[in-house]
Amino acid sequence: LYVIMFLFLLVLGLNSYAILRRALLKNAKQLGTSLARSYAAEERSNLTVYETLLSFGTLNLDRLAEEEAWEDERKELWILQYFKRVQAVVGDGRVDPYAVMNGKIIAANPWEGDNSYDYAQTNWYRMAEEAEGEVIFTDVYTDVIYDRPVITVAQKCVTDDIVIAFDIFLENFQFEAGGFYLPQNASFYLCDKNGRMIWYDTTLTGYPQEEIQAYIDGLLERVENGELEDYDAYVRSPDNDRRAVYYYEMSNGWQVILTVPYNTLLGGLGQFTTVFFIVMMLSLIH
């Protein structure tokens, strides 16, 4: 009878563990997805600031062209003053604003060789031309002037041959993402629509960025293949930590990824299991 009771309690305990584990992981899936969505919404609201500033510039230039018929020289002075206001709003050095007006580059921070810069062949300029007055965001690329990874936000005037653009260096996204609250030992990754990291806050300290990028590439491939949709799906990070993955795609194609260690998700359950087996072992001794 004693053995039967022991086996009954053991089976009951194992079954309870499985039920609790399933419930915890399912709840974590819902919460993690909601967190990823909220982080995406927060980042979207920050990007709206750049969109609003660009639209302010292009709308005013369109108005000046239609109502007041300003000459190019006067427009150029207005654009330079507008750039100063933009930098005052977002913070000095956070964006590098410039414009192309009738084939001429107007820059808040002029660079050497700007007269020979083939802007018409750049991705940001072609995207702005094709967007018919909508704001565009490029993917991450290496800027030929500064030789640094950058994202360009640009918009073309509707009634005038002017394109305004802001270069945003990736380190300047830290301010926006830095306000996010992350679960214990969680990692956050913001990527462009091609999966290249824009900004990240990770526990993988000491790992080179190239290795982290390769890890994200593999993770996104598994997301695309539907391999991480189950509530108990996980990945192994470069430090061999088992992690749940929560993902959300923003309206502009950027991707938000949140990874949380299983130890964080199931920490309390592990303690329960340890206590249960200690009690069971003690019952065997007595």
Regions picked out by a protein language model, each given a short descriptive name:
Residues 1-22, 26, 30, 277-285:
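Extreme N-terminal signal-anchor transmembrane helix of membrane signaling/transducer proteins, especially
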Residues 20, 173-176, 265:
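Sensory-module boundary signal marking interfaces of small helical input modules
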Residues 30-134:
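Extracytoplasmic/periplasmic sensory segments of membrane signal-transduction proteins
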Residues 72-84, 109-142, 173, 203-235:
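Extracytoplasmic/periplasmic sensor domains and loops in membrane signaling proteins
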Residues 79-90, 163-207:
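Solvent-exposed, extracytoplasmic
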Residues 93, 102-179:
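Extracytoplasmic/periplasmic ligand-binding sensor regions of membrane-associated signaling proteins
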Residues 94-96, 153, 185-187:
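Short loop/turn microsegments at loop-to-beta-strand junctions
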Residues 162, 193-194, 205-275:
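Extracellular/periplasmic juxtamembrane segments that couple receptor/chemosensory ectodomains to their
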